[in-house]
């Protein structure tokens, strides 16, 4: 029945979900009679039933949901509504549950999380920021812990051991940033015990549209220092001023692209003294040339960037702010530095990357929650195979959505906004003002200060403090100015948010749901009636004033973001109102049909301070938003189309890497690699002609670079050891060389073990294979990026770029694997090996005042001297050191989507942002540059 349910139409799906909720209701009476211990015992009962194999999760779902509903009532004093039961069932079936703001998505997620955690494979609940992950793990975790499940949270400050413990919990909360980078780091680990994740079973993504759609254009990238190419940046910065537009290259200012023509190519070839710029060996030079021309023609000093203290800083096009720590990607920033004759900062090299699309598609089952997914239903289905199920509201929506008001100038618009807010403030109505940037929110704040209107400003930077402001944004006379993305995850409840106010009061008393759970639970139930009474009394006054008024100061390019803002008002059947104030200077109006509207207003001869309300304008705005949404969808599809090629290669490499990491004895794998390499060499030498035509001298010369060859090819031909003298077949040659290589490998193993002890060769094999695979993979990522950059030109030759990219990428991948094998054999035979110094004993020292401090100091000393403290779970590394293999870890840079829709950069260890950028970093920023929207504010 349940499998059929997913194939039904939307209306029938909702009807079936209602059936699930009704069934859960029939179980409630029996569940309510259970004691706390009996309720908790249900978890073990469910697990036993599932382990028996006769029932699956679908079978136990109704009873499990009834148990969770009762536990939530006893612990949180919150009982799931029927619509929340419906939402929980939709999530369990692997859908996106579209639940309007205020309908209790967080509480809904407890249902499928508990159910899917029963098999013990782990459930990940993904939030948009760490504050929400921590808050939900604490509050919703109270229900799970009451039922006997382990709950933990992944935070950026955790150590690898703490992360491993968190992932081993039944339910793990975290951000897409932390989960994605843990996956990449696991596939860079040099020891199995350094891996932290344990698989991808089931994920529930909160704000699924934001994470899987808005942030999906920016891949997660880990990068490290690369070899610098500053000389080439300088050389092309010298050439660019000598080249002329329309002679050597074409410039499209609107699309922000440049194209080098034939005369330009010839000019560069003459200047550099090379025959063909487009030869494979010269392919990197094309990128330097393009960036030099872009830096010259498309980026103006003091407009797009400024130079201060010998550094180039990007300027935000919308806010005019200097973006400290942000750099253009793909070598463009270095080209601008060369143009301005300042120090050229090193470019970073990508060492690992994955798109959010491909990360989340690894989960066996994926589900999501949001208040606004209907406009993106097609994309969610096409890319993630997720259906969108609109869940009915618990109470009818009575919010009034007023028509947009359009003003001719931005100044007139903001004057009208302030007047409207002042009028609402006088009667005590709470107002939430949505802006599109920090600069605009601060501008409004200054206007309110001039009018002496008390208010709060939210800029999506300090989530914990902002959650407190949002929790009180529905109180009498509260005026809140917020960027569109600020304060997500906290309900604006008329009169104040009971849960938040109660939690704050308990924390002020020193109580914590994790540190002091029993006292916290007791205090919760004691204080709850008082807080509820206070909030209810104030809510009556707020309702009398008209409820929450949401005022948008600009239309977002996505209808979904506008709907999110509107959805903050009118929750749970409360009264409310919303309106957008627009001007012809707004970004969306400028990009689409702004001139037409301006002509209309001019003909009407209306004063600047008189707005118009016209259906034509509303239609134009909707049309513009639809166009932008489609453009962004196409961009994401294009990213995914090319990344799918890399994804298949990534799977192969990471699977091979995992086998190496997990393999106790790699002798068999090393032997096969040795045979493959010898076979490839022999095939290359014997591919053409008869044996007398083979260049065995060249073959032997190549083999001697790999291992100490112990036989002579003349002896093979002249003796009858492998057949008739003078007659040498390819098979005879191959078998003789394989036998010789095996002899040499056995001798090498004896040599290594004499130096570093028994088992040292196995350790060397693991170290070499991991090191070489990682290095060749990094080089491959670099080459694939170059291929991706230039592949678009294949369209001019009537070829499909994505097909050519897949074909050539496959050839490059096979070549990379062959190179990895060859290099590994060379390292295994030739790397210098010595015994690593044994772990020194920690010198005795006087214990500091605190025993914990003493233990920490001793552990730190041991860590510094041995590279890690040996434990039962993590034994000490063997006594082997290989030159060029066991190098120190390089500082890493992490690049991924930020919550405000831009790109965020972090250094390993939580340091300052990187001063360099990879060629792939901030891919979304590059696209924004091409469409006239430069790198956004962090």
Curated annotation (Swiss-Prot):
ATP binds at residues 84, 102-106, 491. One of its GO terms (molecular function) is ATP binding. It comes from the Bacteria. Its EC number is 7.4.2.8. Residues 865-938 are annotated as: Disordered. GO terms for biological process: intracellular protein transmembrane transport; protein import; protein targeting; protein transport by the Sec complex. Its main location: membrane. It is a peripheral membrane protein. SUPFAM superfamilies: Helical scaffold and wing domains of SecA, P-loop containing nucleoside triphosphate hydrolases, Pre-protein crosslinking domain of SecA. It is found in: Cell membrane; Cytoplasm. Keywords: ATP-binding, Cell membrane, Cytoplasm, Membrane, Nucleotide-binding, Protein transport, Translocase, Translocation, Transport. The keyword Protein transport applies. It is an enzyme of class 7 (translocase). GO terms for cellular component: cell envelope Sec protein transport complex; cytosol; plasma membrane. It catalyses: ATP + H2O + cellular proteinSide 1 = ADP + phosphate + cellular proteinSide 2. Monomer and homodimer. Part of the essential Sec protein translocation apparatus which comprises SecA, SecYEG and auxiliary proteins SecDF. Other proteins may also be involved. Belongs to the SecA family. This is Protein translocase subunit SecA 1. It comes from Mycolicibacterium vanbaalenii (strain DSM 7251 / JCM 13017 / BCRC 16820 / KCTC 9966 / NRRL B-24157 / PYR-1) (Mycobacterium vanbaalenii). The lineage of its organism: Bacteria, Bacillati, Actinomycetota, Actinomycetes, Mycobacteriales. The gene is secA1.
């Amino acid at each position: 029945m349940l499998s059929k349910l997913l194939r039904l139409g939307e209306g029938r799906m909702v009807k079936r979900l209602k059936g699930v909720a009704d069934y859960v209701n029939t179980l409630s009476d029996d569940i309510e009679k259970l004691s706390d211990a009996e309720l908790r015992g249900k978890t073990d009962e469910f697990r036993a039933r599932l382990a028996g194999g006769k029932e699956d999760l679908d079978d136990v779902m109704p009873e499990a949901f009834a148990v969770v509903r009762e536990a939530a009532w006893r612990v949180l004093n919150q009982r799931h509504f029927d619509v929340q039961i419906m939402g929980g069932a939709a999530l369990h079936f692997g859908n996106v549950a579209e639940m309007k703001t205020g309908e209790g998505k967080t509480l809904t997620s407890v249902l499928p999380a508990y159910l899917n955690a029963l098999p013990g494979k782990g459930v990940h609940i993904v939030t948009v920021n760490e504050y929400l992950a921590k808050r939900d793990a604490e509050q919703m975790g109270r229900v799970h812990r009451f039922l006997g499940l382990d709950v933990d949270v992944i935070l950026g400050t955790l150590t690898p051991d703490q992360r491993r413990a968190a992932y081993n919990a039944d339910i793990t909360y975290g951000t897409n940033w932390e989960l994605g980078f843990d996956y990449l780091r696991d596939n860079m680990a040099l020891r199995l015990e350094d891996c932290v994740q344990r698989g991808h079973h089931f994920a529930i993504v909160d704000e699924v549209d934001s994470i899987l759609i808005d942030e999906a254009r920016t891949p997660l990238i880990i990068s490290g220092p690369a070899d610098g190419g500053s000389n080439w940046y300088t050389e092309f910065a010298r050439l660019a001023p000598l080249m002329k537009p329309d002679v050597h290259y074409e410039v499209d200012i609107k699309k922000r692209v440049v194209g080098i023509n034939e005369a330009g190519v010839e000019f560069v070839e003459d200047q550099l003294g090379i025959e063909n710029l487009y030869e494979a060996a010269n392919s990197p030079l094309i990128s330097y040339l393009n960036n030099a021309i872009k830096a010259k023609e498309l980026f103006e000093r003091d407009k797009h960037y400024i130079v201060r203290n010998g550094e180039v800083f990007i300027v935000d096009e919308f806010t005019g702010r200097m973006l400290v720590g942000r750099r253009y990607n793909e070598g463009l920033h270095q080209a601008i530095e060369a143009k301005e004759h300042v120090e050229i900062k090193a470019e970073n090299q990508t060492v690992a990357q994955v798109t959010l699309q491909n990360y989340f598609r690894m989960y066996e089952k994926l589900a999501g929650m949001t208040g606004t997914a209907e406009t993106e239903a097609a994309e969610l289905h096409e890319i993630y195979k997720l259906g969108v199920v609109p869940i009915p509201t618990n109470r009818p929506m009575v919010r009034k959505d007023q028509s947009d008001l359009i003003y001719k100038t931005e100044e007139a618009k903001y004057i009208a906004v302030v007047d409207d807010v002042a009028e609402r403030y006088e009667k005590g109505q709470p107002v939430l003002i949505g802006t599109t940037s920090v600069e605009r929110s601060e501008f409004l704040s200054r206007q309110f200060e001039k009018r002496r209107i008390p208010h709060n400003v939210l800029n999506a930077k300090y989530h914990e403090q902002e959650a407190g402001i949002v929790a009180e944004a529905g109180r009498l006379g509260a005026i809140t100015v917020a960027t569109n993305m600020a304060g997500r995850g906290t309900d604006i409840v008329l009169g104040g948010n009971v849960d938040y106010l109660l939690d704050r009061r308990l924390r002020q008393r020193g109580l914590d749901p994790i540190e002091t759970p029993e006292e916290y639970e007791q205090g919760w139930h004691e204080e709850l009636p008082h807080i509820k009474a206070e909030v209810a009394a104030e809510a009556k006054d707020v309702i009398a004033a008209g409820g929450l008024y949401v005022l948008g100061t600009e239309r977002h390019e996505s209808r979904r973001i506008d709907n999110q803002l509107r959805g903050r008002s009118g929750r749970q059947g409360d009264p409310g109102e919303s309106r957008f104030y627009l001007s012809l200077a707004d970004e969306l109006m400028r990009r689409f049909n702004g001139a037409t509207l301006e002509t209309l207003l001019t003909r009407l001869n209306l004063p600047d301070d008189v707005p118009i309300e016209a259906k034509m304008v509303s239609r134009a705005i909707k049309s513009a938003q639809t166009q932008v949404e489609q453009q962004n969808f196409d961009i994401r599809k294009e990213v995914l189309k090319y990344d799918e090629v890399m994804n298949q290669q990534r799977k192969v490499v990471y699977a091979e890497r995992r086998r190496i990491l997990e393999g106790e004895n790699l002798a068999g794998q090393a032997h096969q690699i040795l045979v493959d390499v010898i076979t490839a060499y022999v095939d290359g030498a014997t591919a053409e002609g008869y044996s007398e035509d083979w260049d065995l001298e060249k073959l032997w010369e190549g083999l001697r670079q790999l291992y100490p060859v112990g036989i002579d090819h003349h002896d093979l031909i002249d003796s009858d050891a492998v057949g008739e003298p003078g007659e040498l077949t390819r098979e005879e040659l191959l078998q003789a060389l394989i036998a010789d290589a095996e002899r040499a490998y056995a001798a090498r193993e004896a040599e290594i073990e004499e130096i570093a002890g028994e088992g040292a060769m196995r350790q060397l094999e693991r170290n070499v294979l991991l090191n070489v695979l990682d290095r060749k993979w990094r080089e491959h990522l670099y080459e694939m990026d170059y291929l991706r950059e230039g592949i678009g030109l294949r369209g001019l030759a009537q070829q499909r770029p994505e097909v050519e990219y897949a074909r050539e990428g496959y050839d490059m991948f096979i070549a990379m694997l062959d190179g990895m094998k060859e290099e590994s054999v060379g390292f295994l035979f030739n790397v210098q090996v010595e015994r690593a110094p044994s772990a020194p004993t920690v010198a005795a020292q006087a214990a500091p005042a605190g025993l914990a401090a003493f233990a920490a100091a001793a552990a730190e000393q041991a860590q510094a001297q041995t590279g890690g403290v040996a434990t039962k779970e993590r034994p000490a590394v063997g006594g082997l050191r290989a030159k060029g293999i066991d190098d120190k870890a390089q500082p890493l840079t992490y690049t991924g989507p930020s919550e405000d829709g831009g790109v965020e950069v972090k250094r390993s260890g939580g340091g300052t942002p990187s001063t360099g950028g990879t060629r792939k970093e901030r891919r979304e920023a590059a696209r924004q540059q091409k469409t006239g929207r430069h790198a956004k504010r962090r």
